[in-house]
């Protein structure tokens, strides 16, 4: 479940559960400088997928070259190494346990390990807010297992944040979590993107997300990408950049 960044959504690269995957960084043309309203400090927390690492995902931030991101602090933490059930107990970077691959809408959930991971994510967010960042300028994003953790972290955070972006993720909890979602958390917008050719986290697992969020009282924008497998396309990241830009709060 390591991140693969594809130039085109129709290009699909096969993956193995514990193999290494080539990370392709797309070069971007220089953006002309422009005068914009003063932007306050913002924070983007990116959570990687199973078996991956934070540093391997850091090149993503170079794609966000708009002036609105000049005061953005990026964080790419790495998951701790844990035994993973779907990989026969192999120890690898993992935010929480996963019981089966492919992940479907009905896959078993390990809520206890998810909640432990959520506490760690909340600590990262709390630290940034304590440093002076407006919660409305805090964005949590994640791919695959990191996307599932993004969702859980957003829903259980006691404050309204700028937004949460889920890429090829799934619901890592049961419907009972709805009772734990605060009114503030329900005001945090969600962007959910999923490849229709995903054979690791099936598209049906992604499709189950928006109806659940709607029942919970949250706003979710769901985008399906035909031909895209278990990876992230340039198109998805371009939309993420635009989506965050429209939600950033200025310092004025």
Describe these PLM feature segments.
Residues 2-44, 53-55, 72-73, 208-211, ...:
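A domain-start/cap signature at the N-terminus of enzymes
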Residues 191-194, 198:
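Short beta-strand/loop motif that positions the catalytic acidic residue
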């Amino acid at each position: 479940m390591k991140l693969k960044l594809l130039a085109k959504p129709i290009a699909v690269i096969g993956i193995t559960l514990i193999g290494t995957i080539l990370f392709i960084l797309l070069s971007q043309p220089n953006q002309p400088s422009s005068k914009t309203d003063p932007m306050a400090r913002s924070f983007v927390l990116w959570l990687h997928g199973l078996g991956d690492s934070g540093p391997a995902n850091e090149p993503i931030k170079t794609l966000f070259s708009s002036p609105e991101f000049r005061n953005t602090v990026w964080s790419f933490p790495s998951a701790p190494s844990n035994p993973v059930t779907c990989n026969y107990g192999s120890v690898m970077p993992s935010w929480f346990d996963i019981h089966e691959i492919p992940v479907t809408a009905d896959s078993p959930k390990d809520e206890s390990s998810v909640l432990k991971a959520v506490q760690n994510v909340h600590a990262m967010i709390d630290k940034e807010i304590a440093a002076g960042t407006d919660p409305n300028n805090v964005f949590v994003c994640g791919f695959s297992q990191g996307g599932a953790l993004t969702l859980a972290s957003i829903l259980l955070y006691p404050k309204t944040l700028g937004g949460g972006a889920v890429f090829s993720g799934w619901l890592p909890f049961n419907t009972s979590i709805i009772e734990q979602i605060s009114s503030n958390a329900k005001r945090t917008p969600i962007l959910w993107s999923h490849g229709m050719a995903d054979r690791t986290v099936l598209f049906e697992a992604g499709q189950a997300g928006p109806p659940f969020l709607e029942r919970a009282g949250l706003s979710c924008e769901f985008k399906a990408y035909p031909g895209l497998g278990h990876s992230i396309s340039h198109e998805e990241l371009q939309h993420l950049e635009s989506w965050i830009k429209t939600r950033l709060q200025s310092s004025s």
